[in-house]
Amino acid sequence: MLRITGGKVYDPANNINGVVKDICIADGRIVADVEGGRILNATGMVVFPGGVDIHTHVAGAALNFARGMTPENQRRAVPILHKGERRAGIGGPTPTTYATGYLYAGMGWTTVVEAAVPVLTAKHTHEELRDTPIVDKACCLLMANNELVLDLLEAEEIERAKQVVSWLIRAAKVYGVKAVNPGGVTAWKWGKDAKNLAEPIEGYSKTTPAKIISSLAQIVDELRLPHPLHIHCNNLGAPGNVVTTIETMKILEGRRAHMAHLQFHAYGGDDWHNLRSEAATLADYFNSQLNLTADAGAILFGDAVTITADGPWQHLLYQLTGRKWGNLDVENETGCGIVPYTYRPNNLVNAVQWAVGLELLLLINDPWRIFLTTDHPNGACFWRYPEIINLLTSAEFRRERLKRLPAKALERMTLMDLDREYTLSEIAIIISAGPARALGLTRKGHLGIGADADVTIYHDNPDAYQMFKVPRYLIKAGEIVVEEGDIRHMPEGREFLVQPPCDEKIEEYLRPIFQQVYTMSFDNYPVEMDRIAKPEIQNCK
């Protein structure tokens, strides 16, 4: 049992905004009161629900591929040494599994979502997640280029496609469905892309990106998954792609959806020489679409590693930069591309990208619908989130940083005109309460009775960067695991998954297809439940 007393509590899900009150914990949950137990004096401190990262890339074959491609990053990274319970690890843009858990927890985050998992490599992903300590986890399954599903959409068999998607979710032991460049990764196997949402993709006569998007959104809603379709739009990173992004949002009208790393989809112009921010245009449209949530995918200057299933984009990035390039096909399901990248403040495109992420966070007026991410490790490392929080809470600090950018870049953005400053309550929403709600994780992101006892306690510091960089305490499931940045305990986190209803007869349809087109047998394909660390099945309702 534990009582936290004297701290200013920010619990926006329960309309608590800086109120000094006690938080009581027993058996890993928030309770109304406790008798006895430890008392934690949080006077002069700020109490938040534990952070929730709705979109990150921290485990699986793609991360291992990236680690192998960038040994120079591992050499430069600060090592995490073995100490007591703590295992050794390496940080940097693609931290090792143990380091990932320590770095998230050391910053005050307690739940993370691995946003891109193919079924074929899901066993690898789950085993790495099992090695990622402290934080709770969930996964999104890559689906918008899975040829088992696309073939059924081509044949207008939407009901059977739904059963296949449901079976694949159950087989992969995941929480949600992810659509990456719908149709574009399939087209990449032919050396092409899917830039026009209305044109059939390569290898099909009727299946378009628009059809894939609308069908998957329908399937996710009909399966009643707690998290809506999680979508990475077509034409990521391209000048003028704001048109595609808004077209995608129009296709999704009437359906739930989460728009991933929106910064990479908010550009105007028609080539790299005149690329400009269209964050204001996109935010204005997004504000009217109450069916949508989004995460920012903000960038920060410095080294990154771009990792995505969006193979055609990665090839273009390789051509633009001349950096190392890795490309993989994941059989009939998806692909993978890796390119190391450095964002530079004196680069006009990078300067605009930096501004766009902040502009979206400031111009989208409802913090319950836009969340803090960097699409780790694509835009910046997740452990740099406090830098972004500092930029959001201080207009003066933003203006100081803007002075370091090229004058031509300033003409292509609106950030200098934005005076909005986030409050602590709004920060609590975009890093915890909002993403938890969008994920449908009802015990996360708040400090109400019955919530998981995931609590972060910060020093109340006017310097937001220093405040959020190192919490005073992190409490995970009722146990103090981090104190002043030091890992005290290393509990194993849970993994959330869903098991939507599925017609068992769908296996009769799938088994012969596997024998014909897969290198893995049908019986070896599903992930066994005993590979999952502390699985917790969430209801589909």
Explain the meaning of each model-derived region:
Residues 1-21, 25-26, 60, 73-111, ...:
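Active-site microenvironment of metallo-dependent hydrolases
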Residues 48-55, 113-115, 260-261, 295-296, ...:
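Active-site neighborhood of phospho(di)ester-bond hydrolases with catalytic His/Asp-centered motifs
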Residues 50-61, 228-236:
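Histidine-centered catalytic micro-motifs
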Residues 54-201, 535:
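Divalent-metal coordination cores built from histidine and acidic residues
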Residues 59, 120-122, 145-149, 184-188, ...:
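Flexible loop/turn segments at secondary-structure boundaries
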Residues 70-90, 192-203, 313-339, 394-412:
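A solvent-exposed, charged loop/short amphipathic helix patch at secondary-structure junctions
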Residues 157-181, 185-370:
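Histidine/acidic residue-rich metal-binding segments in metalloenzymes
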